[in-house]
Amino acid sequence: MKKADILVLDFGSQYTQLIARRLREQGVYAEILPFNVSLADIKAKEPKGIILSGGPASVYATDAYFCDKGIFDLNLPVLGICYGMQLMAHHYKATVAPAGHKEYGKANIEIKKDNALFKNLPKKQTVWMSHSDKVENLPQGFEVLATSENSPFCVFGNEDKKFFALQFHPEVQHSEFGKNILKNFAKYACNCESIWNMGSFAKTQAEKIREEVGNDKVLCAVSGGVDSSVVAALLASAIKEQIIVVFVDNGLLRSGEKEQVEFMFKNTLGIDLISIDASEIFLSRLVNVTDPEQKRKIIGNTFIEVFEEEAKKHKDVKYLAQGTLYTDIIESSVVGASKTIKSHHNVGGLPEKMNLKLIEPLKEIFKDEVRALGLELGLSKEVVYRHPFPGPGLAIRIMGEVNRASLELLRKADVILLEELKSTGWYDKTWQAFCVLLNVKSVGVMGDNRTYDNAVCIRVVDASDGMTATFSHLPYEILENISRRIINEVEGINRVVYDISSKPPATIEWE
C-alpha cells in the first residue's frame, strides 16, 4: 500500500480536493480517503498527520458523519477544518449548535496566541468562511488560538497533542494565508519534508510498472491528449520494448485530430503507433442514445472491446494502460460523503469484466501535476499544454443523439473557435475551450429569409487542476468575431451563446 505524508478524510466538502492540492504544491504528498476509512487502513498508510475536511452535515444531526474515534489516539497531529473542527469539538464534549448568524464569504480573524499553524504569519488576516453551525464552548484541554467577529472560538487547539481546529477554509484562494497555514501544519506539527515532486514520482512509478508488468506486454491507449501522451512517455521510460501504443479513431474526434496524433507520436515522440478506425462501430452503438451516462458507458465498453481485439493480435499482452487522473477517480466514485458527479469513460464507464488488467500510473495526481510530469519526461510544451479533450470526444459535447450531421456541424464551429483563440493569444491563457451543440433550435433572420437552425454554446474556462474552474473573461470583440464567423461560415447554425457558469456548481463539460 502506498504511503502518504498526510491523510485527508473526506466528509463531503466541495473543497476537499483543494486541501490535497495545496499540500502537494508544498512538496508534501497528501491523499484523500473516505471519512469512514478503517483505523487499520489509516495505520497502513503510515501518515505523519491527519486532516478532517469540511462537509455539509451537522455533528448533532441523526445523519451526521463520524470517523473512527481511534484517530484521536494515534499520537498523530490532527487538523479539523469547518465540519472537521466541529467534529473535534463534539468528540471532546463541547457543544455544537446552529449558528444564529450564518457565515458565508470573507471574514477577518485575529491571532490570540502564537502557535505552529500561524508561525511567521500576520496577527490579522482575511479568511473564507462557509458554515451554518458554531462551537458554543471550548473543548476541555484546548485553548483559543484565534477569534473572528462572529466566533470567539474561530481557531482552537491543543499544542501538546498537536490538535488544531479551524472554522474557516484555509484551502481556498480567498483565505489569504491559507496555503501557509497548511504548510505550517505539515512542517511544524507533522514534521513533513517537502520532498515530493514529479521527478521522484516518475522514478517511483517506473519502478512500479517494471515490477508489476514483468516480461508481459502493455497495450497503451492514447488519444493525443496530454494524459495519454504522458502515460505513453512514462511507459516508454520504464519498458519501451514491451509497449504497444494504440490510437482508436472512434468517429468522435475533432477536425484533423487523427492526423495530428499520428504525426505527434511518430515524429515528435518517436513512438510507433497503431491506428485503428473504429468509427462505424462507435457511431452505430450511439444511435438513438441521448442520456449522457449511457453515452459514456457505451463508449467505455466499446473502447475496451476494440483494445481487447487488438491485444489478441499480439503475444503476451496482459495489460491496458490508461491516462486516468485523480480527478477522474474522484468524479466517478463516491469518496467519503461526496457524491458521484459523472462516470468517466475510463473509470465508471468501464465494463465490470475485462480480459486485460488495468495500469493507471497517473491516477494519484492532478492535471497540473501531469503537465509537470510530462515536462520532466521530456515532452514538448506544445504536447504538455494542449487543452484537455474528453475520452468520449464530441459525443458529450452534442446534447441529445449523436450522428454524422451533428458531428460535422460541431467540428466546423470548434475549428473557428480555436482559430480565433490561437490567433489572439488567448488559447494559451485558458484551461479549456470548446463548442457545445445544443439540442434546441431557434428562429433567426439571414438576408430576408427566416431561419430555424441550431444553437451553439461556447465554453472557455480558466483553471489550475480541473477540480474548480471559472469562465474566461474573453474580450467582447473576440466573442463577437467567434459568433460572427460561426454563424456566417457554418450552415445550420444561427445562434451562438457563451457559458458563464463556474465549476462548481456546473461541471466543465456539459455531459
From Swiss-Prot:
PROSITE patterns: GATASE_TYPE_1, GMPS_ATP_PPASE. It catalyses: XMP + L-glutamine + ATP + H2O = GMP + L-glutamate + AMP + diphosphate + 2 H(+). Its EC number is 6.3.5.2. Residues 5-195 form the Glutamine amidotransferase type-1 domain. One of its GO terms (molecular function) is GMP synthase activity. CDD domains: GATase1_GMP_Synthase (cd01742), GMP_synthase_C (cd01997). The active site is at residues 82, 169, 171. Pathway: Purine metabolism; GMP biosynthesis; GMP from XMP (L-Gln route): step 1/1. InterPro entries: Class_I_gatase-like, GATASE, GMP_synth_C, GMP_synth_GATase, GMP_synthase, GMPS_ATP_PPase_dom, NAD/GMP_synthase, Rossmann-like_a/b/a_fold. Residues 196-386 form the GMPS ATP-PPase domain. Keywords: ATP-binding, Glutamine amidotransferase, GMP biosynthesis, Ligase, Nucleotide-binding, Purine biosynthesis. GO terms for cellular component: cytosol. ATP binds at residues 223-229. SUPFAM superfamilies: Adenine nucleotide alpha hydrolases-like, Class I glutamine amidotransferase-like, GMP synthetase C-terminal dimerisation domain. It holds the Pfam family GMP_synt_C. Catalyzes the synthesis of GMP from XMP. Homodimer. This is GMP synthase [glutamine-hydrolyzing]. The gene is guaA.
